[in-house]
Amino acid sequence: RIMTFRLDTRWRRRAVRDLALPANSTVLDLASGTGDLCIDLRRAQLCPISIDLSFGMLSNDRSNAPRAQADILRLPMPPQSVDGIICGFALRNLVDLEVFFAECARVIRPGGRIALLDVGVPHNPLVRFGNNIYFGKIVPKIGALLSDAAAYRYLPRSIAYLPDRSVLVAQLQRAGFADATHTQLSGGLTQLMVGTRN
């Protein structure tokens, strides 16, 4: 939160809102980390399930949501068993996004929703320059003071792993989310993709 000046709170709430699911819908929070999205899902009267590969992350999950340690590329869920999926800031860590999108499509019921939030690359050259300086130079120094410097050095490099937004949307559409859309948030600092399962 310090690194984003609390903008991450706004981004997560926007992702939950754009899921646009009715109350009591079951939503998987993939790569759930400390459970921030699960908390926001509960506030929206949704029923989150926290999924993360890291037992350490799950043990620090503050949401009190049901949780499972699992690979998000091989979810321990039957086909068409959940109403929605949300994932925050994990796409850039996945090698094969098409496999991930297909797995999401497998477990979401027809008419269910997906919301994927991750870092973005601002289109405005001035904003992009400032963003590169901030995340490339300043954030790693702050991270070194607060916790793990290596993790914060990885952040700006990991952004390069994400395909262009048109590619991401096309991949989501091919996976079974025909109405998939892409929105830049905060001038492109973050990107949000949402879609409905065919």
Please state what every model-predicted region is.
Residues 5-23:
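Conserved alpha-helix/loop element of class I SAM-dependent methyltransferases that forms part
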Residues 26-75:
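Class I SAM-dependent methyltransferase SAM/SAH-binding core
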Residues 37, 120-171, 181:
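C-terminal alpha-helical "lid/dimerization" subdomain adjacent to the S-adenosyl-L-methionine
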Residues 48, 114-115, 179:
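A short hydrophobic/small-residue beta-strand
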Residues 73-85:
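A short acidic, Gly/Pro-enriched loop at the edge of an enzyme's catalytic core
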Residues 84-97, 120:
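A short SAM/SAH-binding and catalytic strip from SAM-dependent methyltransferases
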Residues 98-113:
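A short glycine-rich, Lys/Arg-flanked "PGG" loop and its adjoining helix->strand segment in the class I
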Residues 175-178, 184-198:
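Core SAM-dependent methyltransferase catalytic element
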